[in-house]
Amino acid sequence: LYFKDDDSRLSFLQGNYITLTNMSDDDVDRIIRYHLEPINISFHTTNPELRCKMLHNRFAGEALKKIDRLYEGGITMNGQIVLCKGVNDGEELERSIRDMMKYLPCLQSVSVVPVGLTKYREGLYPLESFTKEDAKEVLSIIHKWQKKAYDEYGYHFIHAGDEWYILAEEEMPEEERYDGYLQLENGVGMMRLLQNEFAEEYAGLEGDDTEREVSIATGVLAYPLICKMASAIEKKYTKTKIHVYGIRN
């Protein structure tokens, strides 16, 4: 068995995202020849110099040319951009989305998610958390390009991670905007799917008077939604008490 973080075989087999930095021309030829798809690509930016900096790899910018070959070979692709404040957001994000649009329809979806930050960052690049205003700006950019993609190709193409809507205190898009949840494992549409599935199941519950006490642990971002669902359950199951705990990473 051969496992490697940037192994293209794990991309189409298991959905791993790869940067293409260690992919040879032979690898690209094999993908095209056997039509191994979809290939999931970590773009992060289409600015070659910035990509080298972000990935700490001098070949990262040159690797973007491999996407041209995959596109010419008709290979279905998905992409992701992990957004870092002051690095690849703003005008750089606009540039990246504009550049990626040329790969439609082979590039069927791209997710934009905020970089995950924890308190354990000693010796790492100094990154800041996004604010509510930042999130609104990111959503504004994404919604603009969504409309353009939908008008031209009939699908939304570029998708914002759920965190942006929560941070911006905006409603999650309706299910149709997610194009079949192509980026679900990247945290795109999870909250909408959960809300819809909960509503469907909840409508069929009759409730009872059995005494229960339940504890649920969840992340800070999902905490308000889980609390809302727990409250709804308690109203139907009057002797059930649900404790929801938001865990900060």
Summary of predicted features, one role per range:
Residues K102-Y103, L117-N249:
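Auxiliary Fe-S-binding modules of radical SAM enzymes
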